[in-house]
Amino acid sequence: MFAKAFRVKSNTAIKGSDRRKLRADVTTAFPTLGTDQVSELVPGKEELNIVKLYAHKGDAVTVYVSGGNPILFELEKNLYPTVYTLWSYPDLLPTFTTWPLVLEKLVGGADLMLPGLVMPPAGLPQVQKGDLCAISLVGNRAPVAIGVAAMSTAEMLTSGLKGRGFSVLHTYQDHLWRSGNKSSPPSIAPLALDSADLSEEKGSVQMDSTLQGDMRHMTLEGEEENGEVHQAREDKSLSEAPEDTSTRGLNQDSTDSKTLQEQMDELLQQCFLHALKCRVKKADLPLLASTFLGSHMFSCCPEGRQLDIKKSSYKKLSKFLQQMQQEQIIQVKELSKGVESIVAVDWKHPRITSFVIPEPSPTSQTIQEGSREQPYHPPDIKPLYCVPASMTLLFQESGHKKGSFLEGSEVRTIVINYAKKNDLVDADNKNLVRLDPILCDCILEKNEQHTVMKLPWDSLLTRCLEKLQPAYQVTLPGQEPIVKKGRICPIDITLAQRASNKKVTVVRNLEAYGLDPYSVAAILQQRCQASTTVNPAPGAKDSLQVQIQGNQVHHLGWLLLEEYQLPRKHIQGLEKALKPGKKK
């Protein structure tokens, strides 16, 4: 369902009544969750957003977003968990196991065929047709997909594990997963087996060559029934998958030696020190605590890891920053009521100077390579000039006509060549050009045509450029240049008042610079922890505007200038950023 990009219709903060209804719906849909787990999944006070979108096939989907990650989605009044939720509650749904090579096809939009299932020693989970199920990979219980069973367990066994097993709705690495923090599945060890089962499983790992051949082509049967379904890669034996199982099991022991809370505390401090050492400069101070977290700490989180303060011992960012202040690394002040800012940093503190920037993991880089979106590169914007009807006679000798687009250097060359070809350079003063009838008609005002006989070169060229119509050329990476008349509109940032005297930040003209308003809205929603909406821009045909709750000009400016590297001259409204100490 989310194998291709979707279109966001709206993104708003959830109301109290809707939050209570969602809790009730979660309790009904997933009765195995306890009251505390439901409260953890649907928090009482933390921000929770409702995103309404259209999937690429037109299905209307409602997505619930908490902490920047989609946690649930609703389709045709049915509630489904995302992989982010299943990683926290891996036993929420009956789970079926497949081989790692199959994942690529599931991400591409294929359903899971029964030949791709791995039969566990205890047998397949008992499900009925239409039941919601999770799909995991051999060696790791963390689900990588969810789907609906196409038949009951009894029918699966009766069919000899042939045919369509599950209609897949959502997977790790699809576009719904990409709308979150893009973390990788955690390593969750398989459930413990008794000695008899362990012996049986160990024996099953030693596959003979015949069985390996059957496994290599197991998905081809499914492909006959469903053209989108997977085919195992010919250059990699599936016998490697069970070997990975034992390796993952060994690696899990070292990870389990520390509690999840201790691991999150270490990650929090690592991102904190990394951000101070590499991203924050003295000129950035004072720096809003929320900006420090959203624009600096999150970007320092290693690939495959998810920074979640709520899972640390600190629980809140303010408490963590107070601890760092006690260690005299930073100084924090409340410059406006309820809003904390970092006002000073001791960059000579031993913890900062001794901090070693971690190198990116080759494994995580490989895992994320296929799913990482191409980075944004600013367009090449070139000013041009368009030949109007009144200037046609001057430019037609050089092969140009009305409506031709020229660069400034081309205009200069054409005018100089015209003057020299027609012997218009003054013999007594080479810096002057005599004006013939064509030049008079093209560049002089009516009241000047009988008084001005000569012009200096610079004045002639300046007047010529002024008489031409402005135009511009935009070239986006990998695309053909786009040429338009007029001057390119800058990205326009404004502040507006809405109901209850609330401020919102509105940004327009993103499309002219190759930016997708929906993508920008999603990024700002996570960075600012504020609701965002995308609406048609008033008075502009086929143009959209992004609206963010509160004064978010600082976050927006950082995104456009620092991350997207857009020139400041193409952005207007940056001066409206909230000043330190000023109340929102």
Curated annotation (Swiss-Prot):
<dbReference type="InterPro" id="IPR041366">
    <property type="entry name" value="Pre-PUA"/>
</dbReference>
<feature type="domain" description="PUA">
    <location>
        <begin position="93"/>
        <end position="173"/>
    </location>
</feature>
<dbReference type="InterPro" id="IPR036885">
    <property type="entry name" value="SWIB_MDM2_dom_sf"/>
</dbReference>
<dbReference type="InterPro" id="IPR015947">
    <property type="entry name" value="PUA-like_sf"/>
</dbReference>
<keyword id="KW-0597">Phosphoprotein</keyword>
<dbReference type="InterPro" id="IPR048247">
    <property type="entry name" value="eIF2D_N"/>
</dbReference>
<dbReference type="GO" id="GO:0003723">
    <property type="term" value="F:RNA binding"/>
</dbReference>
<dbReference type="InterPro" id="IPR036877">
    <property type="entry name" value="SUI1_dom_sf"/>
</dbReference>
<feature type="domain" description="SWIB/MDM2">
    <location>
        <begin position="383"/>
        <end position="467"/>
    </location>
</feature>
<dbReference type="InterPro" id="IPR048248">
    <property type="entry name" value="PUA_eIF2d-like"/>
</dbReference>
<dbReference type="InterPro" id="IPR001950">
    <property type="entry name" value="SUI1"/>
</dbReference>
<dbReference type="InterPro" id="IPR039759">
    <property type="entry name" value="eIF2D_SUI1"/>
</dbReference>
<feature type="compositionally biased region" description="Basic and acidic residues">
    <location>
        <begin position="227"/>
        <end position="238"/>
    </location>
</feature>
<feature type="modified residue" description="N-acetylmethionine">
    <location>
        <position position="1"/>
    </location>
</feature>
<feature type="domain" description="SUI1">
    <location>
        <begin position="491"/>
        <end position="564"/>
    </location>
</feature>
<dbReference type="GO" id="GO:0001731">
    <property type="term" value="P:formation of translation preinitiation complex"/>
</dbReference>
<dbReference type="GO" id="GO:0005737">
    <property type="term" value="C:cytoplasm"/>
</dbReference>
<feature type="region of interest" description="Disordered">
    <location>
        <begin position="223"/>
        <end position="257"/>
    </location>
</feature>
<protein>
    <recommendedName>
        <fullName>Eukaryotic translation initiation factor 2D</fullName>
    </recommendedName>
</protein>
<dbReference type="Pfam" id="PF17832">
    <property type="entry name" value="Pre-PUA"/>
</dbReference>
<dbReference type="InterPro" id="IPR039757">
    <property type="entry name" value="EIF2D"/>
</dbReference>
<dbReference type="InterPro" id="IPR003121">
    <property type="entry name" value="SWIB_MDM2_domain"/>
</dbReference>
<comment type="function">
    <text>Translation initiation factor that is able to deliver tRNA to the P-site of the eukaryotic ribosome in a GTP-independent manner. The binding of Met-tRNA(I) occurs after the AUG codon finds its position in the P-site of 40S ribosomes, the situation that takes place during initiation complex formation on some specific RNAs. Its activity in tRNA binding with 40S subunits does not require the presence of the aminoacyl moiety. Possesses the unique ability to deliver non-Met (elongator) tRNAs into the P-site of the 40S subunit.</text>
</comment>
<keyword id="KW-0648">Protein biosynthesis</keyword>
<keyword id="KW-0963">Cytoplasm</keyword>
<comment type="similarity">
    <text>Belongs to the eIF2D family.</text>
</comment>
<feature type="modified residue" description="Phosphoserine">
    <location>
        <position position="237"/>
    </location>
</feature>
<feature type="modified residue" description="Phosphoserine">
    <location>
        <position position="254"/>
    </location>
</feature>
<keyword id="KW-0396">Initiation factor</keyword>
<dbReference type="GO" id="GO:0003743">
    <property type="term" value="F:translation initiation factor activity"/>
</dbReference>
<keyword id="KW-0007">Acetylation</keyword>
<feature type="modified residue" description="Phosphoserine">
    <location>
        <position position="361"/>
    </location>
</feature>
<dbReference type="Pfam" id="PF25304">
    <property type="entry name" value="WH_eIF2D"/>
</dbReference>
<feature type="compositionally biased region" description="Polar residues">
    <location>
        <begin position="247"/>
        <end position="257"/>
    </location>
</feature>
<dbReference type="InterPro" id="IPR002478">
    <property type="entry name" value="PUA"/>
</dbReference>
<dbReference type="Pfam" id="PF01253">
    <property type="entry name" value="SUI1"/>
</dbReference>
